[in-house]
Amino acid sequence: MILFKSPRFTRLYCTFFLLLVLVLTLVGSRIDPARKRTGGALRVVADRVAQLSSRPWSRVGAGDTAEEAHRRAWELARATQYAGTGARVQRFLEKALRGEPFTVAAIGGSVSKGRGLTPPKSAQPEPEGEIHGATTLYSRENLHFLVFDWLNATFPHPNNRFVNGAQGGVGAGYFAWCFKEHIPTDVDLVLVELGINDLNHLRVIAKYELLVRSVLELDSAPAIINIETFTTLFHELISSSALHNDVLAYYDIPSLSIRDVLLPRLMADPDVQMPRWFRTGGDVSLGDDKVREWGGVPVDLMHISAKGHGLAAGLIINYLSTQLALVAPSTPKGLFGRFSAARLRKTLEHVYDIPDTWLTQSFDPTELPERRAPVCRSMNSAKLHNRVSGTDDVPENDQVRGLVLHPSSHGWEPWAWMEKHYLVARKPGALAVFDFVISAPLPATHDDDDDEVIEDPLDVYSAFEGTATRAASVRREMPTRLRLKDQVAARQEQPTRRSSTFRKAHNEGSSDGGTVAIGFQRSANYGLGSVHCWVDEDRTKGRRLDGWWEIKERNMGIVTEVATGLQPGRHRLQCELLADTLDPLKRHEFRLFAIVHN
């Protein structure tokens, strides 16, 4: 019996059975030419499954003992914050299984950049020929590189591509507007890691939703896998991952976290385990607000170590392996079940795809939300754009990188700290002026396939027949449902009713006009000052933005709105450095790194 359970026997048996299927299919196609198309499809899948069966790395845990298999399953279960259907990930794996090249990209902060990891022997240049970002973006210890390395080994193709778009010290508020500045738009799989970058505040929900929804709406229809790291630095262990997870569930995005796998070990022996899983050595020293001493060793509690990266990557790879087992089973029974399962998924997945309504907006199935394309100009992007933001529809000959100041600006200059780039002002009265164009909203879209009447869920439980009840329920006949587009047409003939309670607080998805915001640094350590920003000539409706804050452990880039409700057309944003400052030492420096609008 042990022989029949061994991975080697399973691979041999599977390969033999697939060859038998191919022979029978070829014979059948000679008898019935109509079967040739089916035979071709079977041959492609059979070849790929046979190749996978010969690669020991394609099946995580293929050689595990029973105890190791149980432990591996336990760790994945503890790490899984939301599993979902896996439909998009399976769709990505099916593409790879067909032998097509794929692109994997990463969105994240300094953990994803590889803070403290060993740089690769040669840094990977950007397509434009300039390296923008840390040299550890493509470290062989980086969790995202490790995931791509496994995928590339499992599905080798010379045109497989990995792009690490991580940016240190920013969160979903930045990437929601600017992710296209850092990753390609033809991406197939996006790995997101922002658990310690986003503040633990309800406002994060809307920003995070804008990010994941915008990524899912790319023409390439990518899959997303969310991975959360964690920190023990603050007063509570709970973090923004708690706010991310409801958004991830709403959009059926799998989410994994290393926290609940590591915590039992950290609690059992912190002096030994903390230096193993978090960053040490190098520039880690006491006196840094992110550093605490464990076991006599200074430990950076915001950034996981190379071993921590390996754990995060291993959990993602384990998850991918479980999904691969569904699309490329290693047993004959599973292989044939796969075809019916794939067809069933394709009939169901439109039900669970991108919802017509936002999670952070009021429910109204007859009023589709406006779609506004985010526009970003970032000092940390290598992409070229027209000088006036929002006019890239007609490319100019002298396109530039970063932010372009209007000639009327004064007192601002480019400045960089390592790989982070800013426009900086230090003298009160300095004025930054930017021209930008608000575009008209994109037409609301709706898939006619969604007009089908969806059957009730199967898991609607009823009492067994004969069970005594206090009162019999009365079954009412439900009225015939209008097709959604007919409801929309009927609604347009009625006065518009709109609940604005949440929408006023959720400007990222607002349908009440365009928005403009700026990205700037906040810190308690850098002596940062304040600016007053306004749009066009209405200075009185402007907004004060403070660079200094009280959070000593975080030096972060924040994106904050200046104005909303802007009409389509050309506008002018102005920001003036104020003499008044929150910095205890009365310093004034202000660091601006992005202008975003829609």
Where are these regions (language model features)?
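Active-site segments of SGNH/GDSL-like serine hydrolases
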Residues: 193-197, 210-245
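Alpha-helical scaffolding within the catalytic cores
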Residues: 87-92, 148, 172-183, 206-214, ...
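Signal peptide-proximal N-terminal region
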Residues: 127, 144-162
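Structural recognition of the beta-strand scaffold that forms the well-ordered cores
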Residues: 103-107, 112, 161-166, 188-194, ...
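Soluble non-cytosolic domains of exported or imported proteins
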Residues: 102, 137-142, 169, 173, ...
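Extracellular serine-dependent O-acyl
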Residues: 30-31, 53, 223-228, 239-295, ...
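N-terminal secretory targeting modules
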Residues: 1-107, 111-137, 156-158, 298-598
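Oxyanion-hole/transition-state-stabilizing segment in secreted/luminal serine hydrolases
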Residues: 105-107, 113, 117-119, 130, ...
